[in-house]
């Protein structure tokens, strides 16, 4: 575990998608709880920025479009981000991309917590450990302490929608997102499970909203068919 100092500058790397960010919330809260005075920055995907801006744990956000390394302009911008005076870089993504960042963009003396070969603080063997617990352990290696996140920031966040009907009828809504990455269909939760949750919530008086991309249409329709009107 790293020594805690008020002037520490911590860079966290965690890209999207949405599910990965949700799994990281406990780790984000734990990192901030253990480093209350530190400057903590989050490097993430552009699509996550609007959500990340609402989070109470970060002082700075860095957009990483994850462009190809041969895109010299984008690569230079990311390299410059890594060349700031970071006390520690916390890799919660642990992907081939972030390992390439470590190999090519990060100063040789940088403190790096992750799985990159040769990094200063390698993570333990996480075989059989779920993503949420992996990231909490990673946060603790950067001085974090166990902390369940206070989600009031999300409840109190300003709603952004073009659907005025949603904004003015003052009903209670629950959003279900049945889709997932097409590259990993095994991650998709069964439609009947979503429908069971939707039916239970509808019975309690909530309005159910199903969202997704065009690729999620089949999953959304399956859930919709099992829900009441």
What do these predicted regions represent?
Residues 1-229:
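Catalytic machinery of carbohydrate-active enzymes
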